[in-house]
Regions:
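N-terminal type II signal-anchor transmembrane helix
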Residues: 2-86, 124, 144, 361
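Peptidoglycan glycan-strand catalytic modules in the bacterial/periplasmic cell-wall system
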Residues: 6, 79-289, 311, 472, ...
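Active-site SXXK
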Residues: 116-118, 276, 350, 461-462, ...
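Short, well-structured active-site flanking segments
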Residues: 126-136, 221-223, 283-288, 500-524, ...
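Conserved catalytic neighborhood of penicillin-recognizing serine enzymes
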Residues: 145-171, 236, 300-311, 504-570, ...
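Non-catalytic structural connector segments
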Residues: 148, 283-341, 345-409
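A penicillin-recognizing enzyme superfamily signal
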Residues: 340, 344-360, 392-458, 463, ...
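Mid-domain, small-residue-enriched loop/turn segments at the edges of structured enzyme/sensor domains
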Residues: 524-532, 564-604, 613, 617-618
Length: 821
């Protein structure tokens, strides 16, 4: 450091010496010359020096002044502009931005705003060429005489500063490190850029660019966002007094902010109105009248996650991350227009359905557990240190342990000291309340909420039409539609599809009976005897059609089919139909849905059946348009025949059997869609071990829906099927959504029947056969994974809330009769 200072001091000393030599040489040139010639020579020399200085700054001579934008950069400015997300029905559903800015044209702004701006910020705007020399002289005079400073920067200079970030983005070079010279170099660059801007653009373009780039405070960049933020209006509809408020803020956005400092804003607004009067743009009567108007705001600060479909928008951001990197775009600054598949009306129906059903589920969950702690192991015992383990994974715990490394008492004190904290609630429309809770208590409060996800998809395109990732994005950012959970009996779709692939039909029969088999237990590292059982632990001993076994979700038949068809082949079929998560191809329990998958891929796979065996990749974005209006991305429209038409047709019949067969687990869907008699519906419920995960998948020819319900941690769940089964929790979400969509005339195109068989090899005898009627009372607990001996190595993942399974499969007790539905 000392050597560096000595070098700088030495350089400065040499520079002073050389400067004195040059000045002495220059002085000697004019010894004996008349004074007027000396004056001219000095003036010309200063002018040439100034021009050379400007050129040196512009080209960054010897890296002394730092880089400046060239003409190419000025003609193609890179303003940070928000990217907008549009729904399929052309509704703006959100933005991605660092600076919330949406450009507008000159014509889209009220002309009085331009007059207001020029009268206040740059009264000689139309007569100068970027630099107002009269203004400079006036500012210098005021500074010398002490009569108060006036601004000398023109609108063009302010644009140069705002658009090209001269004071931050571009360095000031070596000379800029010398005290006092940095501001001179910065102002010089602003003059140069302002002159270039005047050469490249007309005056209206400069005004437009200025209004689109300037910061109006409160996170509002540009006139369009400012008009919306402060007045909930458009630039075209701004009144004169509103324009005066916005222009007045430009002098100091905090001091004159109408929200935070209304008195200052009022005084500044009135001064701006006086400026307009002085320049003849309003009359004295108009000025006095406008001054009497109180400031009335409709203040709303737009945030990244305001509006609909927050989880969907986050999914879009994740999907486009790689595309943006590969194509040179920044999702948050490039001003892209992203057109998505989602329908804003269907999204509203989905969010309403989730809210309505989850309020009921949460109330049931609270009443069900009462004052007991709901985090229990597979034996129903409270898990020790459950909350403490979660607290230790929180950032606040890591901060406190770093601050007090040798003082655990201080850490415990702060973790257990109550303080006001905003938490989620179903008790108000804002879904938020403030409670006095400690860190420990807030964690305990939040983990008791039940969660959900919902997806609606078009089977003919793979386009997602509605997407709910959880109950509140503000409180839980993790998207449950992509969470890995056990699908339970919803996975049986693939078991029976492979059975159809291998020549079986819905009317072929299998017996519901006890059997056992030797399997490898990865935990014990030995072979064990595995006895798959039905949800109620009872086998009928009867032979039944496959459509009845599927509709009633008989586990023994599904496992037996899994062994007949081959687990690996079932997994291959699942992959072809749209499952991307890795499946345990060695576990017989895969037939009962023991491998984790997510709702989005499961919904996509069910679409394959609905679209006659054709698989379409899940699509969130249809096209992207850049800031210049050029189409830079169009979603590919491809499909492949994943399974045969015959298998798909027969599985359509199987899914419909879930609503039509006696004891079908999806029968309660009729309570929601019964009036839509012009549409075929089918479905499959699913519930994983201990009711930790509840599912429902609903299909119709033109729309497929899926819902998941469960705790954030698998150890948090209902204890009984009466409350925790997929038919009681997830199915109503799908039902409420379908009810709204089917009753809306705008969605008539989603009505319809499945086609009659196109394959002459398909006969009615394959799927039209007598139903199976049980000789005993069946239970609702027929959609659960029930395996007496755990044959999977499923570990608890401590670093995430949604994790793998936490306990052994065990038989679920009989809870409720089907006739109670």
């Amino acid at each position: 450091m000392k050597n560096k200072k000595e070098q700088i001091a030495g350089f400065a000393s040499k520079a002073r010496y050389k400067t004195k030599q040059i000045l002495q040489w220059y002085k000697n040139l004019y010894i004996g010359t008349p004074w007027w010639k000396k004056t001219i020579a000095v003036f010309v020399s200063l002018l040439i020096t100034f021009i050379l200085y400007l050129g040196a700054v512009d080209i960054n001579l010897f890296w002394l002044f730092g880089k400046s934008p060239g003409f190419s950069r000025i003609l193609n400015p890179e303003t940070s502009t928000a990217s907008e997300i549009y729904s399929a029905d052309s509704v703006l559903i959100g933005k991605f931005f660092n600076e919330n800015r949406t450009p507008v044209s000159y014509e889209e702004v009220n002309p009085m705003f331009w007059k207001c701006l020029i009268d206040t910020e740059d009264e000689r705007f139309y007569s100068h060429h970027g630099i107002d020399f009269l203004g400079l002289f006036g500012a210098a005079k005021d500074a010398i005489t002490g009569h108060g400073g006036r601004g000398a920067s023109t609108i063009t200079q302010q644009l140069a500063k705002n658009m090209f970030r001269v004071r931050s983005q571009y360095s000031t070079g070596i000379i800029g490190k010398i005290p006092g010279l940095k501001i001179l170099i910065v102002k010089t660059k602003e003059w140069i850029i302002a002159t270039k801007l005047e050469m490249c653009y007309d005056k209206n373009d400069i005004l437009r660019m200025y209004a689109n780039t300037v910061d109006f405070g409160s996170g509002a960049y540009g006139i369009k966002t400012a008009a919306k933020t402060y007045f909930k209006t458009t630039p075209k509809d701004l009144t004169i007094e509103q324009s005066a408020i916005l222009v007045g803020m430009l002098k100091a956005t905090t001091f004159y902010n109408p929200k935070n400092n209304p008195k200052n804003s009022l005084q500044r607004r009135n001064q701006v109105l006086e400026n307009m009067l002085t320049h003849g743009h309003i009359t004295r009567a108009e000025c006095d009248s406008l001054k009497q108007i109180e400031i009335k705001l409709s203040y709303t600060v737009e945030k990244n996650y305001d509006g609909q479909a927050q989880y969907f928008r986050e999914a879009v951001a994740n999907e486009l991350s790689e595309w943006c990197d590969e194509n040179g775009y920044d999702l948050y600054t490039s001003g892209l227009k992203i057109y998505t598949t989602i329908d804003s009306r269907m999204q509203r129906y989905a969010e309403d359905a989730v809210a309505k059903q989850m309020k009921v589920i949460q109330r049931n969950f609270k009443n069900h557990w009462g004052n007991r702690e709901p985090w229990v192991d597979e034996k129903g015992n409270t898990i020790p240190n459950f909350i403490d383990d979660i607290v230790k994974r929180q950032p606040v715990y890591k901060y406190l342990t770093a601050k007090y490394p040798n003082n655990p008492d201080s850490v415990d004190y702060y973790l257990n000291t109550p303080h006001p904290v905003k938490v989620f609630t179903w008790d108000n429309d804002q879904l938020e309340t403030t409670l006095d809770l400690s860190v420990v208590d807030s964690v305990k409060y939040m983990v008791k909420f039940m969660h959900c996800a919902f997806v609606a998809m078009e089977p003919q395109t793979g386009e997602v039409k509605a997407y709910v990732g959880d109950i509140s994005f503000r409180s839980w950012k993790y998207d449950k539609a992509r969470a890995q959970r056990q699908p339970g009996s919803t996975f049986k779709l693939f078991v029976y599809t492979e059975a159809m692939n291998q020549g079986l039909t819905p009317c072929d029969k299998r017996r519901d009976e006890f059997f056992s088999m030797d399997v490898w237990d990865a935990k014990k590292k030995e072979s064990v005897r595995w006895t798959p059982s039905n949800a109620d632990g009872v086998f009928s001993g009867d032979s039944m059609p496959l459509k009845s076994a599927f509709a009633k979700s008989i586990n023994s038949v599904a496992v037996r089919l899994g062994q007949e068809m081959g687990i690996r082949r079932i997994a291959e079929t699942a992959y072809k139909m749209g499952i991307k998560s890795p499946l345990d191809e060695s576990a017989p329990s895969l037939a009962l849905g023991s491998s984790d998958i997510n709702l989005l891929e499961l919904t996509n796979a069910y679409c394959t059946v609905a679209d006659d065996g054709k698989h379409h990749e899940t699509t969130l974005v249809t096209k992207i348009v850049d800031s210049k209006g050029a189409e830079v991305y169009v979603a590919p429209n491809t499909s492949e025949q994943a399974i045969s038409y015959k298998s798909a047709f027969l599985m359509q019949k199987m899914l419909q059997a879930g609503m039509r067969e006696p004891g079908g687990t999806s029968m309660s869907l009729w309570g929601y869609v019964g009036k839509a008699n012009d549409t075929d519906f089918g479905g499959k419920t699913g519930t994983s071990n201990n009711h930790s995960d509840a599912w429902f998948m609903g299909v119709s020819p033109k729309l497929v829906v899926g819902a998941w319900v469960g705790g954030e941690y698998r150890s948090i769940h209902f204890r009984t099927g009466a409350l925790g089964q997929g038919s009681r929790t997830a199915l109503p979400i799908c039902g409420l959504f379908l009810q709204s969509v089917m009753n809306d005339p705008a969605f008539k195109h989603y009505h319809g029947h499945f086609n009659k068989p196109k394959d002459p090899g398909i006969t009615s005898s394959m799927y039209e056969c007598s139903s199976y009627y049980s000789q005993r009372n069946d239970t609702i607990d027929v959609d659960s994974v029930t395996v007496e001996n755990d044959i999977e190595a499923i570990e608890h993942e401590e670093n995430q809330g949604i994790s793998a399974g936490e306990g052994e499969h065990r038989p679920i007790e009989k809870e409720i009769k089907l006739e109670d539905l």
